[in-house]
Amino acid sequence: VVGPECMALALFFLCAAYATNALSPKIAGHFQVATTIIKLIPLLLMAVVGIIVGLVSDQGVLLENMANPGAETTGNPLFGAIVATAFAYEGWIIATSINAELKDAKRNLPIALIAGGIIIVAIYLFYYIGVAGGATVEDLMNDGATTAYLNIFGGAFGNILNLFVAISCMGTLNGLMLGCTR
């Protein structure tokens, strides 16, 4: 979807997220939990299946990718890491905006932020190892993680991946709206 249709669709989802959060924060919270769980499905599937396929495949793709990381990247990798880290911590600011609604926020919010951060790091670490088991480094650099999904799960799941990405984006929009409207 491109052009004015894209803007109309974005405006619809923005208004829907605002209306949901304004009229029923409880429903918005349940929607947030649901989208988070749905977002984890392809990540965990790729982590588990990708590692297994990468280890038992005839080509030994996972072991080859770990031994040969591919061509050097151009640019400053530290800058890319800093930008990604700053973007990741954006959610922490939003999470603290709902502390008044949490039970024993002084105790529970730091636990949630630290435990949540550790869990997300672990999930993405295993996800990227699984992706490395699904395609060669060169294929991943040229075509992205979709290649690994197509190689491991076939065409149908490779296309369903876009649905998971859309649900993830709606969850992000809802989460931002949930925190920013407070």
Predicted regions and their residues:
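Helix-loop-helix connectors at the membrane interface of multi-pass transporters/channels
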Residues: 1-9, 42, 99-105, 111-119, ...
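Hydrophobic, small-residue-rich membrane helices and short re-entrant helix-turn-helix hairpins
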Residues: 23-33, 92-123
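Membrane-interface loop-to-helix entry segments
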Residues: 5-57, 113-117
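Membrane-helix boundary/coupling elements in multi-pass transport proteins
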Residues: 93-102, 158-182
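Hydrophobic alpha-helical segments and their helix-loop junctions in multi-pass secondary transporters
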Residues: 37-68, 86, 128-135
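TM-loop-TM module centered on a large, flexible mid-protein loop between adjacent transmembrane helices
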Residues: 1, 114-174
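Residue-level signature of transmembrane alpha-helical entry/exit and packing/kink sites
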Residues: 2-10, 14, 36-39, 73-81, ...
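Hydrophobic alpha-helical transmembrane segments of multi-pass membrane proteins
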Residues: 15-19, 79-86, 160-174
